Regions:
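Conserved ABC transporter NBD signature motif
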Residues: 64-76, 359-367
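Conserved beta-strand-loop-alpha-helix hinge in the C-terminal portion
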Residues: 226-252, 514-541
Length: 568
């Protein structure tokens, strides 16, 4: 950064939201230089999103509170600037895209910033077309942005940023609603923009492995409102600070530790290719010689959910045709596939929000195809992808207790059950908080807790780990594993390949109206053809296997067995 201008400056910044007793940011200081690409990483509730609100003016213009210290954006104080002036310096993609859309069509939304700057129509149309082409959304330019899939919404938001001329690009969890392949492409695109236009890029994320697939100048680690580490990716990965901050280390780093590598001996830890070094190769080959103890499966378990010959269309558009799959009692199944393939639509059909044209849906052997939504709701718990669409109460406790109160459960039992769930979901300390003060990930856990407290027979969760950091992921999945052992069949609609490998008993891949794979997660996710078709992402263990010319199945099975699948 020698000779570069400071473009972002935080000087001893402390901030406390009006409704909170304790500050969310505590004496935060850091500088970001012009043209840098910086990752700000932290667990849910760490304060990383609050830093982004300070940068883009949402604090103090939208979120009120008490602030001390100084923030400078290109030498100016954002708190003294009008929002339209600040947006000329820094452009933001929010985590919740629905809260960001302005236009009635995708094209209008991307053009909005240029309309405000009086760009000539001819130039505007050209810029919009170029931006949509870069994110592969040209075919959706006349679509309603609120009616496309979550990943497509993310790409529209990205197109809007690309159409702006801001020098600083701020991304708040850009991978949250993208399928793995789209996420990988998005990170590559951000790198291209950074290099080609010398933009200052700041990314707020907790998905360390996925984000660090591209090069970064620096990583700032936030924990409990403080910056606990500030260094290069190499320095951060070597320090071990990610684990203490509640974040997941990249799998190849965990593998190297598992086989006994001394990380201090390696100088390119920010790339999986580090495993090609001779000492690492030798240790990994020795590791493969160890015996694997395989889990025993109970093939005699009763089916919790059966889907037979299921067909559904939106008008003349066929979404899926003759789907057949089942979930046994206590089985955890992950449904994988690209954005827009119909995963969330399938859950809506199963729960009765949409009616299928042909086929049967059975719960514990009973056909519920003609059952009401209320009847299905007694058997199936459904957690939506966007928590803001499910929240109806002001406080955390009241939201989780709402369903039990409707069922006339005794007051003391409600308190006991809600408190138990909140402790397991890592929310007990927030039980009396207003939900509006929570982070996106915390809101997600509130909605999940409000469903789990009702003890459904089948549980469907749409992107349950979106917005969840590694610490809360482990806590939540530990609880889900306990629920599965009680005999509840669980279906995860997810892009999280880590979840599928670490917790799934079976993975189903939906592609082009059909199921193209149904097997163990290892066999599905280590199959490169399936991964490519389903817009998934090659797992780092598969990449390592290619680098070392070893079996990806063998390496993954041994790795998972040695790490210990957390529900065992």
């Amino acid at each position: 950064v020698s000779g570069r201008k400071k473009i972002i400056e935080f000087k001893n910044v402390t901030f406390k939201y009006t409704r909170c007793q304790e500050p969310t940011l505590k004496n935060v200081s850091f500088d970001i230089y012009e043209g840098e690409k910086v990752l700000i990483a932290g667990s849910s509730g760490s304060g990383k999103s609050t830093i982004s609100y300070c940068l883009n003016g949402l604090i103090p213009h939208m979120y009120e509170g008490e602030m001390s210290g100084e923030i400078l954006i290109d030498g100016e104080r954002p708190c003294e600037m009008k929002l339209h002036e600040l947006s000329g310096k820094i452009s933001t993609i929010l985590q919740d895209q629905d809260a960001q859309f302005i236009g009635l069509t995708v094209k209008e939304d991307v053009a909005f910033v240029m309309e405000n700057r009086n760009i000539p129509l001819k130039d505007m149309n050209l810029s919009v077309a170029e931006a949509l082409e870069k994110v592969d959304m040209e075919a959706f330019q006349n679509s309603n942005p609120h009616e496309i899939s979550g990943g497509q919404k993310q790409r529209v938001s990205l197109a809007g940023v690309l159409a702006s001329k801001s020098g600083i690009l701020l991304f708040d969890e850009p991978l949250a609603n993208l399928d793995p392949a789209s996420g990988e492409n998005a990170m590559k695109l951000l790198s291209e923009i950074h290099k080609k236009y010398n933009k200052t890029v700041v990314i707020i994320e907790h998905r360390i492995e996925e984000v660090l697939s591209e090069k970064f100048d620096r990583v700032l680690v936030v924990s409990k409102g403080e910056i606990i580490a500030n260094g290069t990716p190499q320095e951060i990965l070597l320090s071990g600070v990610l684990v203490s901050a509640g974040l997941r280390e990249p799998h190849y780093i965990r593998l190297m530790k598992l086989v006994g590598c001394n990380l201090n001996e390696y100088h390119n830890l920010d790339s999986p290719s580090v495993v090609k070094e001779a000492s690492a190769q030798e240790k990994i080959h020795n590791f493969l010689a160890r015996r694997v103890i395989k889990r025993e499966s109970d093939e005699e378990r009763e089916y919790a959910l059966e889907v037979q010959n299921l067909t559904f269309s939106y008008g003349e558009r066929l979404i899926f045709h003759d789907l057949n799959f089942s979930i046994k009692k206590g089985e955890i199944v992950t449904l994988l596939g690209a954005n827009g393939v119909g995963k969330s639509t399938l859950s809506s059909v199963i729960t009765g929000f949409l009616r299928h044209s042909r086929g049967e849906i059975k719960i514990l052997g009973e056909d519920i195809s003609n059952a009401s939504i209320k009847k299905r709701g007694e058997l199936i718990g459904y957690v939506m992808q966007n928590p803001n669409l499910m929240i109806t109460k002001n406080s955390v406790f009241d939201e989780v207790a709402y369903g039990l109160k409707n069922k006339k459960v005794a007051k003391q039992e409600i308190v006991e059950r809600v408190h138990q769930l909140l402790k397991i979901c890592g929310l007990y300390g927030y039980r009396n908080w207003p939900i509006s003060a929570l982070s996106f990930g915390q809101k997600k856990r509130v909605t999940i807790a409000s469903i789990l407290v009702l003890n459904p027979m089948v549980l469907i969760l749409d992107e349950p780990t979106a917005g969840q950091d590694y610490k809360h992921y482990l806590e939540f999945m530990g609880f889900i594993s306990k629920i599965s052992k009680m005999g509840i069949g669980i279906l995860f609609i997810t892009h999280d390949m880590h979840l599928a490998l670490e917790y799934g008993d079976k993975s189903i891949v939906l592609y082009d109206t059909s199921i193209i794979a149904e097997s163990t997660p290892t066999r599905v996710l280590m199959n490169c053809d399936i991964v490519k078709k389903a817009s998934l992402r090659e797992h780092s263990l598969s990449n390592i296997s290619k680098l070392l010319n070893i079996s990806s199945l063998e390496l993954t099975e041994r790795y998972l067995a040695e790490e210990g699948r957390q529900y065992e």
